[in-house]
Amino acid sequence: MNLGVIFGAKSFEHEISIVSAIVLKNVLKQGLKFIFCDANRDFYLIEQKDMRANFFSSGKYKNSKKLSLAKGGFYTHSLFGANKVECDVIINLIHGMDGEDGKIAALFEFYGVKYIGPRLEASALSYNKELTKFLAQKAGVKALDYEMLTRQSEPKFHYPIILKPARLGSSIGVSVVHDDSELAYAKDVAFEFDKDVLVEPFIKGVKEYNLAGCRIDGKIKFSIVEEPKKKEFLDYEQKYLSFSNENKVKEAEISEELKQKLKFNFSKIYDCGFDGAIIRCDFFVIDDEVYLNEINPNPGSLANYLFEDFESTLNALANSLPKEREIKIDYKFINSITSVKGSGKL
């Protein structure tokens, strides 16, 4: 199977997406087609040998073949016409805006392109942190209390609190606030990236666990459970470095009971429309209860480091994607009206 990877795009997480794509190139043994979307939303076909960070930061990518998106996939163009880039399935590896907000999913659906990634509705629900709270409630999964903050309003929670832009990942614009003296700056940072800011109580020392998975042939394939290294929280630079990880992580040393609880809650989230995607859910465990922290619909490097057999999982998912319902357009209704009217003026 020929797999393609689309990455980059007009997003605050553009550079993290580049790192994710480079990692995927190094992790997967099979050849991949790399499709770069730059900040102007122009598409380029990138050679494997050019998949280096400075190839993009220097602007050299502009010398690559330019692509257009049309029915069935991406195309190069020459004096002799258009040639389709041979990709059976394209992996959506765009982080943040354009990739996780549903834009690229909508384009792929419209043009009939098979892809690995969240569908439009799932993208919208997981991209916006407030909508994710509604999704968790609907799924019967616990989540922390929250409030939405405006520039003029003050948080009602007791300190410490955490401020998060509603539509960003990778810890961009996120701040932990311990007292009034830190609040104004944290608000300025968060509102620089989004007009909507979510506030949650910050629970120091809470247990955190990450679990990824996807549905293959009707059954969810789970990754191992990871317990991330403890810091107050992972900032952008630490997330950037974690996305460049090509090594498998150590499985969390937890009870079988807790492992099953995490899988049960993951399944309830995944069943809310994430078929066709590898997602990662980040959970808190408080007083033996599992709480959803956030959904990563396009996790860094597709969370390859959490799977013992990532390449076979990816290929199996590519063969188990949701199928769009076929709709036959036969114009029977119009023909029946015109035949009755007899004038043909409709």
Curated annotation (Swiss-Prot):
Needed co-factor(s): Mg(2+); Mn(2+)
Highest taxon in the source lineage: Bacteria
Record keyword Manganese present: yes
Intracellular or extracellular location(s): Cytoplasm
Pathway the protein acts in: Cell wall biogenesis; peptidoglycan biosynthesis
Biological process per Gene Ontology, one example term: peptidoglycan biosynthetic process
Binding positions (ATP): 159-209
Residue stretches making up the ATP-grasp domain: 133-326
Enzyme Commission number(s): 6.3.2.4
Catalytic activity of the protein: 2 D-alanine + ATP = D-alanyl-D-alanine + ADP + phosphate + H(+)
Bound cofactor: record note: Binds 2 magnesium or manganese ions per subunit.
GO molecular function ontology, one term from the record: ATP binding
Keywords: ATP-binding, Cell shape, Cell wall biogenesis/degradation, Cytoplasm, Ligase, Magnesium, Manganese, Metal-binding, Nucleotide-binding, Peptidoglycan synthesis
Major localization listed first in the record, in broad terms: cytoplasm
SUPFAM superfamilies xref list: Glutathione synthetase ATP-binding domain-like, PreATP-grasp domain
Positions with a binding annotation for Mg(2+) 2: 294, 296
Sites where the protein binds Mg(2+) 1: 282, 294
Pfam family, one: Dala_Dala_lig_N
GO cellular component: cytoplasm
InterPro entries: ATP-grasp, ATP_grasp_subdomain_1, D-Ala_lig_Van_CS, D_ala_D_ala, Dala_Dala_lig_C, Dala_Dala_lig_N, PreATP-grasp_dom_sf
Role of this protein: Cell wall formation.
Similarity comment: family membership: Belongs to the D-alanine--D-alanine ligase family.
Listed name of the protein: D-alanine--D-alanine ligase
